[in-house]
Amino acid sequence: MKYLKRTVLFLPLFFLLLNKASAQRKLDYTKLVDPFIGTGGHGHTYPGAAMPFGMVQLSPDTRLEGWDGCSGYYATDSLVYGFSHTHLSGTGIADYCDVLFMPTTGKPQLNQNDYRSHFQKKNEAASPGYYSTLLDKYQITAELTATLRVGMHRYSFPKTSEANIIIDLQHRDPVLDSWVEVVNDREIRGFRRSSSWAKDQSVYFYAKFSKAFKTYSLASDNQIKDGEKKLQGKNIKMFVQFDNPGEVIAKVGISSVSAEGALKNLDAEVPDFDFKKVMKQAKDTWQKELSKIQVEGGAPVLPPLPQQNNMGYGFGGNRPQPRTKTVDYAHIKQTIFYTALYHCMLAPNIYNDVDGQYRGLDQQVHKAEGFNYYTVFSLWDTYRAEHPLLLLIDKKRTLDFIKSFMAMNEQGGLLPIWPLASNETYCMTGNHSIPVIVDAYAKGLRGFDAEKAFKMMKDAVNRNQFGLDSYRKNGLVLAEDEKESVSKTLEYAYDDWCIAQMAKILKKDQDYAEYIQRAQNWKNVYNNQTGFVQTRTNGGWLSSFKPSDVDDNFTEGNAWQFSFSVPQDVNGLIKIMGGKENLENKLDALFSASSAMTGKSLPDITGTIGQYVHGNEPSHHITYLYNFTDDPYKTQYYLSMIMNTLYKATPDGLAGNEDCGQMSAWYVMNALGFYNISPGQNNFQIGIPIFDKATINLENGKKFVVASSGNATNSYYLQGMQLNGKPYDKLFLSYENITDGGYWDVFIGKLPNKLYMADLEKPVAAITDYPIVVNPYLVSPSKTFTKPITIAAASAQDSVKLYYTLDGSTPNLQSKLYSNPITISNTTTIKIIAAKNSMTSKVVSGTFSKIKEDVKAGVAVQTGQHNPSKKIQYK
């Protein structure tokens, strides 16, 4: 009887918990996505309809030019030119916006300034796979949805005998060639070949309309050509006109291969004109993808505050106004999170047709056998977080990415750097398809030819372009040989480290030895006299150094950000800096320095905290370097600051360019509480999870659950951790910790728990095999002189000997031993090496030229006196 009573008592609680769990499973994550986030500021995203990783991005075009018009849309614009079928998400260079459709009424206009329309933000709506707006000029409601390869328009016209759809093939990018053809009174097809960032991009399209058009006209150079069914040229437009149609649906398939391919895509993916069905399919697909990570909670709901006396606020005062509405910060956080996850899935983009055909980097048609071929890889950005995230939740697609890389290599002769459509743009530095491949292989992904991929990686870094020849010869890229020399040295060293990891797995000992040594070349641009990476030229350091200078020796940044770009050898960086305390002090200085940049002005440098630049990717790992110091709580402090201040649920809610998923992937990973600072190695650094609970639904059927207590009090300092019910005492998680499934419980408090943090095992990112001898450097007041000058030599490395020549010959261990500064009176080339334990550095060379008295002296190599005992102090 007692047992029965207990059962009855617990039944309501059981059903309550069951209903709560069921509700969580049924939660519509698409409602937590706001596609307008990132369309303002410098986010450069678009709000239109797209499928996850789809070929079509059907979105409104409101801006024709300018840096903040890269995606074709900007949040504050009030004019719309139409709806085109391809868009880039968050890039810093404009392209795409192909095949524009624009519904109008009245006499058809072909000039874009005549057919454009005002629209109002209050009439816009967007959700994953859907967009709508009202065109004020025509009172037409335009709705958009999409499948992978088809864009679907639904236009609701007012009553009119002149309901038009303009098709503009000249829109946006310079056109190399185009044509359009009327197939019948319900179908048209066409082609557009354009040149912009992608120098030679082809888009074919095939469009079908739900109703027959009563008439049409084709135009070349804005001149109507009566009676023509097909026109070809560089400025081709047309319109179709309906008589009081009410609603017209246009479905448009696209292809890089042919109009026939576009038709195949269209018929396969959208066989009818059921707009609602396609919209639901898009929503369901997005729901499935977004459900791969389920988050709950995150912050308390703050109730309204009582009305306060307004005294003291004044006009334009900066005091906060009384809160009159309930603020659900958890919902805001979840909106930021799921919009970020959504952005992570807008690129890369599938590029093959339904039959597998695609246009390759050689501009020839190929067929993807057994995989889908993708394009739009912003690899300098996305190797850092986007690809590690997708490797966790989408291994199948990651395998397709790698097979796409290898196909690109076969067709274009190089692993991709920044591939766009059927073009390699060669944008940015390094070759960061390499870490994507290596990270996947190191974490167990198979299904591709690893030996062939390894050869491709070696070929990519042994070319005689992009400064790689200078890098191999000198152990660094010299400024006189290549722009962005410091950044390229650091990027190449990291890529070499990745190749070394692959060689180690494949048991290629000779390759491992070579590339693990090359991975240490970052040391050759680190100046121990200043504590920063610096430009090397003519045997020494470039003079007039300012760490805040943005110049041509760095890629979209300066020495502050790039001095920490050694994720493969953080422990080596600590050693060369003189210890953990110096690293911590340097990090403190980074975050507390003035945010003012000197030198060039670059729009990419945004979202600053001191000289930390979250709006650009080289800074994205820096906060985690505190984990290697004695005060890892500072990682948690700055992560919380970044997530709470540089990500917002507003159009300007991104700190910089979205960069095809990287800016958002950083948030997703860090919101979960971990981040891989060096893809290619197995561990994720521990940060601070921001949700009460986050469940990663893995492809192997397992779940990794992150449970965080303390978020309800807006705290962000680690107090304790458990993994699968047992105390966890490391500042990192292994990949297997996550993919094997389990529970990671994190306890958070308001104050740093330094005693607890001191007991945690610190991460290691160190290169210990095959240490190199660091290049020495020359110190001279100038590289030209009129009277005898004295040139000193030095090394940042302890216990080395320097050997040099003055006759142009290559120095060796039998050359003259350097002991005192060298005085020269004639034009001389000094070549010098450092030696330690029978190993030598690369040869460092500097030429110093004697000139006549009346010739102005050249730029100095380095001014001032070398002080080998100088201690760097960071404040």
Model-predicted regions and their roles:
Residues 495:
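ATP-dependent phospho-/nucleotidyl transfer catalytic cores
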Residues 699, 723-726, 807-808:
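Short strand-turn-strand beta-turns centered on an Asx-Gly dipeptide
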